[in-house]
Amino acid sequence: MARGRKMCKPRAVEAAAAAVAATAPGPEMVEQRGPGRPRSDGENVFAGQSKIYAYMSPNKCSAMRSPLQEENSVAHHEVKCPGKPLAGIYRKREEKRNTGNVIRSAVKSDEQKSKDTRRGPLAPFPNQKSEAAEPPKTPPPSCDSTNVAVAKQALKKSLKGKQAPRKKSQGKTQQNRKLTDFYPVRRSSRKSKAELQSEERKKNELIESGKEEGMKIDLIDGKGRGVIATKQFSRGDFVVEYHGDLIEITDAKKREALYVQDPSTGCYMYYFQYLSKTYCVDATQETNRLGRLINHSKCGNCQTKLHDIDGVPHLILIASRDIAAGEELLYDYGDRSKASIEAYPWLKH
């Protein structure tokens, strides 16, 4: 069985290692500057030695370590800080933080004031924090006058930016107008049942009595006799009755054949349908009634209408529009046959 050899360090080597460890510099910072390399303004050069301690038992001394191990445990680190000194940088950072805090506190106080003014003198909610009661934070004494001026300018800009949309909204509210400013209010022109019944009674009285008021006979150029309004008629008003003999169609055809034989007689016959039957009002015979003398026009101011009284139809004329005094009364005869137009050319107009 072979025996192994144990290698031991000579005592001279251990002594040399102890001497090197004793003369090595400590962990404090030492400024190093090589020849020909002066320190520039604003540049801080530090050469620090960070000593790495090996995990050793407290019984072992530094003399037991080899010189190679001692050299490896020491490292030189050179730190360069170009630019301004560190103290100035730290001071500027603190000033920026202080100004930011001042701006935030001022903006918060203004927002709280605006909320309070909108809310009015109402009592605050129980869970709400009373931020408005707290006074605004004053800038710390470390801030100089320039920082305070910058904070005020920033606060003014923020307030202007918030007030601008309010002005726009106020302008919009001022421009809002009612719909009635552009369109008039439309009121119903319908008449009540009582009003309609009273009008029907008046028409019945006028028709049965035969009164014809508000008109007169006058000579019209190119037409002969005509009827002129002597008072104002409103739209829908009763004007006059087309009065004559009410006959059925069979009797009307016989009379019409007789009237054709005498050209000087003329034709004043008006045909209409009532309850699925055709009737005719013959006003050829000369009377003092004015309805038979109203002339024809396609753009007249009157129109015919049937009015029933006790089951008997009456042909009446009502105003199709407002009629002024002195205006001629006209209505459309409604005859478009070729024979009638050839006999009476004025029916075209």
From Swiss-Prot:
Sorted alphabetically, which Pfam families does this protein's record hold? SET (PF00856)
Q: Extract the Gene3D superfamilies matched here.
A: SET domain
Q: What is its EC number?
A: 2.1.1.-, 2.1.1.361
Catalyses:
L-lysyl(20)-[histone H4] + S-adenosyl-L-methionine = N(6)-methyl-L-lysyl(20)-[histone H4] + S-adenosyl-L-homocysteine + H(+); L-lysyl-[protein] + S-adenosyl-L-methionine = N(6)-methyl-L-lysyl-[protein] + S-adenosyl-L-homocysteine + H(+)
GO molecular function per UniProt: histone H4K20 monomethyltransferase activity; histone methyltransferase activity; protein-lysine N-methyltransferase activity
Q: Which residues carry this modification: Phosphoserine?
A: S57
Q: Cellular component per GO? A: chromosome; nucleus
Keyword GTP-binding: yes or no? no
GO-annotated biological processes: cell division; negative regulation of transcription by RNA polymerase II; peptidyl-lysine monomethylation; regulation of DNA damage response, signal transduction by p53 class mediator
Chain residues that bind S-adenosyl-L-methionine:
K223, G224, R225, Y268, N295, H296
SMART domains per record: SET
Phosphothreonine found at: T138
* Segments of this protein annotated with the region Disordered: 18-46, 65-207
Biased composition of type Basic and acidic residues is found at: 107-119, 192-207
Per the database record, which ranges form the SET domain? 213-334
| Reported modifications of this chain | Ubiquitinated and degraded by the DCX(DTL) complex.
Its annotated compartments are: Nucleus; Chromosome
Q: Where is the composition biased (Basic residues)?
A: 154-170
Q: Does the keyword Nucleotide-binding apply?
A: no
Q: Which UniProt keywords apply?
A: Cell cycle, Cell division, Chromatin regulator, Chromosome, Methyltransferase, Mitosis, Nucleus, Phosphoprotein, Repressor, S-adenosyl-L-methionine, Transcription, Transcription regulation, Transferase, Ubl conjugation
Q: Which InterPro entries match?
A: KMT5A, KMT5A-like, KMT5A-like_SET, SET_dom, SET_dom_sf
Q: What does this protein do?
A: Protein-lysine N-methyltransferase that monomethylates both histones and non-histone proteins. Specifically monomethylates 'Lys-20' of histone H4 (H4K20me1). H4K20me1 is enriched during mitosis and represents a specific tag for epigenetic transcriptional repression. Mainly functions in euchromatin regions, thereby playing a central role in the silencing of euchromatic genes. Required for cell proliferation, probably by contributing to the maintenance of proper higher-order structure of DNA during mitosis. Involved in chromosome condensation and proper cytokinesis.
Q: Which family does it belong to?
A: Belongs to the class V-like SAM-binding methyltransferase superfamily. Histone-lysine methyltransferase family. PR/SET subfamily.
How is this protein organized at the quaternary level? Answer: Interacts with L3MBTL1. Interacts with SIRT2 (phosphorylated form); the interaction is direct, stimulates KMT5A-mediated methyltransferase activity at histone H4 'Lys-20' (H4K20me1) and is increased in a H(2)O(2)-induced oxidative stress-dependent manner.
Domain comment as written in the entry: Although the SET domain contains the active site of enzymatic activity, both sequences upstream and downstream of the SET domain are required for methyltransferase activity.
What name does the UniProt record give this protein? N-lysine methyltransferase KMT5A
From which source organism is this entry?
Answer: Mus musculus (Mouse)
Q: What is the lineage of its organism?
A: Eukaryota, Metazoa, Chordata, Craniata, Vertebrata
